[in-house]
């Protein structure tokens, strides 16, 4: 299964979310190929810390040019995850045919391919959208995200209509306390989004929490049993998302609390 994270709006946590989902799936025992198509390089840096600073020959640009991942993957520092590192050479191949990535990805060997894309819309992003079995767009509830979500929807319908049914959105930077106030900016934009888009995963609310930065910057794990509310909510959100993509039914204990395959990741 190929999962593409795509958002034209930068700063919504797209790369971190891709990492969190990939790590949760890997912790469940699935074999993951992480394909970093974002020239910001943050996912590559996260997965290859302590391995190498640059990958001049093993990278996404070389893989796309030669239409194969064989010889271009790197074993990451996280068990069960290999990565095709990002490269600034992506700028040189922006005119590449949008079928290239689909021809490049391996048919077997991995349970999931997770693709991180740049916050833009070009042929490289089209490659990632076209290759996807599931497209995930994190949205922060504001006017800028509404505008870019409309833009992405229009381009999907115009250029990749067969992928529209595979596209889903979910809320990020969610503040649970604001749910109590119907006139809060969050609540008002949630109503606008839900009126205009029918593809919102309302059960996925990625919280606004320092635990997100700690996860990628200090390797501090998140846990559904954490005493820190932010860590707990982050772990729950990505367990729910992992359950959706793996089609795993969420179980509950006798008190109605959700039970997940992975407590800590």
Where do the protein language model's features map onto the residues?
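P-loop NTP-binding core
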Residues: 1-265
């Amino acid at each position: 299964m190929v999962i593409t994270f795509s958002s034209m709006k930068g700063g919504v946590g797209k790369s971190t979310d891709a990492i969190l989902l990939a790590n949760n799936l890997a912790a469940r025992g699935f074999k993951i190929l992480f394909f970093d198509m974002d020239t910001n390089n943050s996912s590559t840096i996260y997965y290859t810390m302590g391995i190498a600073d640059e990958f001049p020959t093993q990278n996404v640009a070389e893989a796309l040019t030669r239409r194969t991942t064989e010889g271009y993957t790197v074993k990451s520092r996280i068990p069960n995850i290999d990565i095709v590192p990002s490269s600034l050479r992506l700028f040189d191949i922006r005119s590449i045919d949008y079928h290239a990535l689909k021809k490049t990805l391996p048919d077997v060997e991995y349970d999931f391919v997770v693709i991180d894309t740049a916050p833009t819309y070009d042929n490289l992003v089209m490659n990632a959208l076209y290759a996807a079995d599931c497209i995930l767009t994190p949205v922060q509830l504001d006017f800028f995200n509404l505008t870019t979500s409309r833009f992405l929807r229009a381009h999907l319908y115009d250029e990749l209509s067969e992928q529209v049914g595979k596209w889903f959105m979910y809320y990020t930077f969610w503040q649970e306390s604001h749910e109590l106030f119907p006139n809060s900016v969050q609540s008002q934009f949630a109503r606008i989004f839900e009126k205009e888009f029918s593809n919102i995963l309302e059960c996925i609310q990625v919280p606004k929490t320092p635990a997100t930065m700690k996860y990628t910057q200090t390797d501090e794990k998140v846990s559904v049993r954490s005493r820190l509310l932010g860590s707990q909510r982050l772990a729950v959100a990505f367990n729910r998302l992992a359950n959706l993509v793996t089609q795993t039914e969420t179980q509950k204990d006798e008190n109605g609390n959700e039970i997940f395959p992975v407590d800590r990741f």
